[in-house]
């Protein structure tokens, strides 16, 4: 003690249970349960990082080792204790990828190392089966009960009426029944043919699509021309009939019907002039002489101004088919110019005594599926005191009236399905598929796979066909690329053994690396191995060249495809260019992937199926929410047979398309009850894998990705063009753009996609490593030449 300096040191040794130093701050007590705010406050308090912690926290020495002010900490602990006593259902669910301190950001980012646009560049991989809006008003229809089978409303008549009984030429009637295999006339043919043969009065024909309107006005013209015996009608006699139609495809189809009819009388010569073809060739055909001319309004007006060999002085019939579509495309002024030119140059009075069996004045015929205001305006311009013939499938109305008589017209409208609407065929089954936006692509794939399986299971040798309608050509091109990946193209090659040309499948290698490739250089017919071994996809829209459109349509119409591996299931991706008037054989199904822009467009689309008494089905894709009201607001009115309007579940469609064949059998054999919490089976894994393959393909191929972005933006623009009367169902402001972009295989945010398309840097900043290739001067010259040729055509490119 003597050596002691008098100082006494008091050391407070910490207990072994208490953490020391920074370890205490880092490890701390793990806090679980309760509100996030309370958990955060408690965690910070335990780490010594609370608000005003230095001022409020006073550490005592000696026996008192607790904080003086612990009121906030105690309140936080009490709130946690009460939260733990609440039932599990009321607890807030925390995603597995988050720690207990809460999310680090507003959205969860997933890193993708295999793709160019993955990882940090605003790329998000969302699940297909989460955050999907459920259907609120429409419930799936129970199809287990027996359904009523309705008789076809547009089938040929099965009574004693025949083509001979309608007053047609015996030779022509025999050709129809024996060579062309027409058994009996349809309702509209029974009403129109006698009227055109017996009278010279202008005519307005209203009938549903697929009812045989084309033959109803072609047969009387042929009958009259064939009946001239004293002065036989030849190509030198002149032009006697002009048929105006809105689209080139319908022109080609009517011309094909004319070619089959002239086989019984070779002296009559048909002709065709349409936009996209060479004017020089058309002028040569007109110079040789034609008796019946099928044309589009723009090209016909062009020839009337510039082709002197086109003589319309002897014109006896002017037929306007699809009058409602002619007015929608803005051809009123062109048609007025055509009719004025015909009236100005008419010289019928000079040949009345020569052709005594032909009309003494021009007969105008207007065919339309509806009597809308614009159609009435067109009728008032070209028709003179016309007779109206209408065939209503619902009330069996077959009558005539004065077109200009408002009182008679109003009475007719009230009896004839409100006069302004046509109806779907009675035998057509209309299905409504309400599918969330993220699942649109996989739902379409599942439906096409199902149809391919059904077609392949049938060994009757009949080629089934399906039509899928899109709202714009950009979306069509993207989906065509998706479903024809790794597909083969068809080429004709000479067989060395037989010395004949055969159609064979050749692997098609996509040229996406060449950014200067023109759309016309790519094939419009490819096989679809991802849908089935015997599936083939065609594309048809107005941006293709006329040669491609004609070749594609002709290949699709063929009864049997040539080649060893002929496609049994043919699928046509098209816009509304193929919705009017085209008579395509064996169309078993019509899929409206994008909603129509009007009810009339819907009826024309589904009218490609269930034609002339045949069975058919149609599927309309709708989004949950406001679009469901479109069924009761617009669709149900034009489908009078309620049993044939059915709501189907998208889960059932996905199961049928992606489920393995053994799964259904295992579920039936299983004796145990299924787990109610397990909503999905293996089919959802297959669907997710299929969709992820599409996304990875877009990440690996920059040009394909750009086409997907263009398709997405074009789809949104097309969606915004719905009629104002239907804006309550199709409101672009209510779309979930992020989920909709998912259906195009895109992982970027819609805002970033909009910047890339709008001309800003956008995605280009992400892909700085790739340099844009300079266009080859030779290819640029050829492309500019093609643009110049196309610009010379005055035909509306629809």
Swiss-Prot record:
<dbReference type="GO" id="GO:0003723">
    <property type="term" value="F:RNA binding"/>
</dbReference>
<feature type="region of interest" description="Disordered">
    <location>
        <begin position="1"/>
        <end position="105"/>
    </location>
</feature>
<keyword id="KW-0698">rRNA processing</keyword>
<keyword id="KW-0347">Helicase</keyword>
<feature type="short sequence motif" description="Q motif">
    <location>
        <begin position="161"/>
        <end position="190"/>
    </location>
</feature>
<keyword id="KW-0690">Ribosome biogenesis</keyword>
<feature type="domain" description="Helicase C-terminal">
    <location>
        <begin position="443"/>
        <end position="670"/>
    </location>
</feature>
<dbReference type="InterPro" id="IPR001650">
    <property type="entry name" value="Helicase_C-like"/>
</dbReference>
<dbReference type="Pfam" id="PF00271">
    <property type="entry name" value="Helicase_C"/>
</dbReference>
<feature type="short sequence motif" description="DEAD box">
    <location>
        <begin position="321"/>
        <end position="324"/>
    </location>
</feature>
<comment type="similarity">
    <text>Belongs to the DEAD box helicase family. DDX31/DBP7 subfamily.</text>
</comment>
<comment type="function">
    <text>ATP-binding RNA helicase involved in the biogenesis of 60S ribosomal subunits and is required for the normal formation of 25S and 5.8S rRNAs.</text>
</comment>
<dbReference type="GO" id="GO:0005730">
    <property type="term" value="C:nucleolus"/>
</dbReference>
<keyword id="KW-0067">ATP-binding</keyword>
<dbReference type="InterPro" id="IPR027417">
    <property type="entry name" value="P-loop_NTPase"/>
</dbReference>
<dbReference type="Pfam" id="PF00270">
    <property type="entry name" value="DEAD"/>
</dbReference>
<dbReference type="InterPro" id="IPR025313">
    <property type="entry name" value="SPB4-like_CTE"/>
</dbReference>
<keyword id="KW-0694">RNA-binding</keyword>
<dbReference type="GO" id="GO:0003724">
    <property type="term" value="F:RNA helicase activity"/>
</dbReference>
<feature type="binding site">
    <location>
        <begin position="207"/>
        <end position="214"/>
    </location>
    <ligand>
        <name>ATP</name>
    </ligand>
</feature>
<feature type="region of interest" description="Disordered">
    <location>
        <begin position="659"/>
        <end position="678"/>
    </location>
</feature>
<keyword id="KW-0378">Hydrolase</keyword>
<feature type="region of interest" description="Disordered">
    <location>
        <begin position="402"/>
        <end position="421"/>
    </location>
</feature>
<dbReference type="GO" id="GO:0016887">
    <property type="term" value="F:ATP hydrolysis activity"/>
</dbReference>
<dbReference type="Pfam" id="PF13959">
    <property type="entry name" value="CTE_SPB4"/>
</dbReference>
<dbReference type="InterPro" id="IPR014001">
    <property type="entry name" value="Helicase_ATP-bd"/>
</dbReference>
<protein>
    <recommendedName>
        <fullName>ATP-dependent RNA helicase DBP7</fullName>
        <ecNumber>3.6.4.13</ecNumber>
    </recommendedName>
</protein>
<dbReference type="GO" id="GO:0000464">
    <property type="term" value="P:endonucleolytic cleavage in ITS1 upstream of 5.8S rRNA from tricistronic rRNA transcript (SSU-rRNA, 5.8S rRNA, LSU-rRNA)"/>
</dbReference>
<dbReference type="InterPro" id="IPR011545">
    <property type="entry name" value="DEAD/DEAH_box_helicase_dom"/>
</dbReference>
<keyword id="KW-0547">Nucleotide-binding</keyword>
<feature type="domain" description="Helicase ATP-binding">
    <location>
        <begin position="194"/>
        <end position="389"/>
    </location>
</feature>
<feature type="compositionally biased region" description="Basic and acidic residues">
    <location>
        <begin position="69"/>
        <end position="93"/>
    </location>
</feature>
<keyword id="KW-0539">Nucleus</keyword>
<feature type="region of interest" description="Disordered">
    <location>
        <begin position="752"/>
        <end position="776"/>
    </location>
</feature>
<dbReference type="GO" id="GO:0005524">
    <property type="term" value="F:ATP binding"/>
</dbReference>
<feature type="compositionally biased region" description="Basic and acidic residues">
    <location>
        <begin position="666"/>
        <end position="678"/>
    </location>
</feature>
<dbReference type="InterPro" id="IPR014014">
    <property type="entry name" value="RNA_helicase_DEAD_Q_motif"/>
</dbReference>
């Amino acid at each position: 003690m003597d050596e002691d300096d008098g100082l006494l040191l008091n050391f407070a040794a910490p207990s072994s249970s208490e953490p020391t130093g920074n370890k205490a701050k880092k490890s701390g007590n793990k806090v679980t349960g309760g509100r996030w705010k309370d958990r955060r406050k408690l965690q910070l308090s335990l780490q010594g990082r609370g608000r005003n912690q230095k001022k409020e926290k006073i550490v005592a020495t000696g026996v008192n080792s607790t904080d003086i002010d612990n009121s906030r900490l105690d309140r936080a602990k009490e709130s946690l204790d009460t939260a733990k006593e609440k039932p599990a259902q009321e607890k807030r669910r925390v995603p597995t990828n988050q720690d207990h301190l809460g999310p680090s950001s507003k959205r969860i980012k997933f890193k993708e190392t295999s793709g160019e646009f993955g990882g940090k560049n605003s790329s998000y991989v969302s699940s297909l089966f989460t955050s999907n809006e459920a259907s609120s008003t429409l419930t799936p229809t129970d199809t287990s009960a027996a359904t009523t089978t309705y008789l076809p409303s547009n089938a040929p008549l099965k009574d004693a009426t025949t083509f001979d009984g309608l007053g047609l030429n015996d030779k022509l009637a025999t050709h129809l029944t024996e060579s062309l295999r027409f058994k009996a006339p349809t309702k509209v043919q029974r009403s129109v043919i006698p009227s055109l043969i017996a009278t010279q009065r202008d005519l307005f024909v209203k009938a549903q699509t697929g009812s045989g309107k084309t033959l109803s006005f072609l047969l009387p013209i042929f009958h009259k021309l064939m009946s001239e015996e004293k002065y036989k009608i030849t190509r030198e006699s002149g032009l006697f009939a002009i048929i105006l139609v809105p689209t080139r495809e319908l022109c080609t189809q009517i011309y094909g019907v004319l070619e089959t009819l002239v086989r019984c009388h070779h002296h009559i010569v048909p002709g065709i002039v349409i936009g996209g073809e060479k004017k020089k060739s058309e002028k040569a055909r007109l110079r040789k002489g034609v008796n019946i001319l099928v044309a589009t309004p723009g090209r016909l007006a062009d020839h009337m101004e510039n082709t002197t060999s086109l003589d319309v002085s002897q014109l006896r019939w002017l037929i306007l088919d699809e009058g409602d579509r002619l007015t929608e495309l803005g051809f009123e002024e062109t048609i007025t110019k055509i009719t004025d030119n015909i009236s100005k140059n008419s010289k019928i009075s000079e040949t009345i005594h020569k052709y005594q069996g032909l009309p003494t004045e021009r007969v105008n015929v207007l065919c339309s599926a509806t009597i809308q205001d614009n159609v009435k305006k067109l009728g008032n311009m070209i028709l003179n005191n016309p007779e109206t013939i209408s065939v209503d499938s619902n009330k069996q109305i077959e009558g005539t009236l004065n077109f200009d008589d408002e009182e008679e017209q109003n009475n007719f409208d009230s009896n004839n399905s409100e006069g302004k609407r046509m109806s779907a065929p009675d035998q057509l089954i209309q299905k409504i598929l309400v599918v969330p936006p993220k699942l649109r692509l996989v739902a379409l794939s599942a439906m096409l796979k199902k149809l391919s399986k059904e077609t392949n299971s049938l060994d009757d040798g009949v080629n089934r066909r399906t039509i899928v309608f899109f709202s714009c050509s950009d979306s069509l091109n993207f989906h065509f690329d998706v479903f024809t990946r790794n597909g083969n193209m068809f080429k004709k090659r000479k067989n060395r053994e037989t010395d004949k040309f055969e159609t064979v499948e050749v692997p098609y290698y996509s040229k996406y690396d060449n950014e200067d490739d023109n759309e016309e250089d790519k094939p419009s017919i490819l096989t679809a191995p991802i849908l089935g071994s015997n599936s083939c996809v065609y594309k048809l829209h107005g941006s293709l060249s006329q040669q491609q459109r004609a070749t594609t349509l002709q290949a699709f119409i063929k009864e049997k495809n040539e080649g060893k591996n002929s496609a049994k299931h043919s699928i046509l991706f098209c816009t509304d260019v193929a919705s009017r008037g085209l008579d395509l054989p064996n169309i078993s199904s019509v899929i409206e992937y994008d909603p129509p822009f009007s009810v009339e467009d819907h009826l024309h689309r589904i009218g490609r199926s269930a034609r002339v008494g045949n069975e058919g089905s149609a599927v309309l894709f709708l989004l949950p929410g406001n679009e469901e009201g479109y069924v009761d607001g617009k669709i149900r009115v034009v489908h009078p047979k309620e049993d044939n309007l059915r709501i189907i579940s998208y889960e059932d469609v996905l199961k049928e398309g992606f489920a393995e064949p053994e799964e259904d059998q295992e579920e039936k054999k299983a004796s145990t009850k299924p787990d109610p919490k397990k909503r999905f089976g293996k089919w959802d894994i297959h669907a997710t894998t299929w969709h992820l393959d599409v996304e990875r393909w877009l990440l690996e191929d920059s040009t394909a990705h750009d086409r997907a972005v263009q398709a997405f933006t074009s789809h949104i623009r097309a969606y915004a063009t719905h009629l104002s009367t239907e804006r309550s169902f199709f409101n672009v402001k209510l779309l979930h753009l992020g989920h909709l972009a998912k259906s195009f295989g895109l992982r970027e945010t819609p805002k970033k996609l909009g910047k890339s398309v709008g001309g800003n840097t956008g995605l280009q900043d992400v892909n700085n490593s790739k340099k844009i290739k300079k266009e080859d001067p030779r290819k640029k010259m050829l492309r500019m030449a093609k643009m110049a040729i196309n610009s010379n055509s005055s035909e509306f490119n629809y």
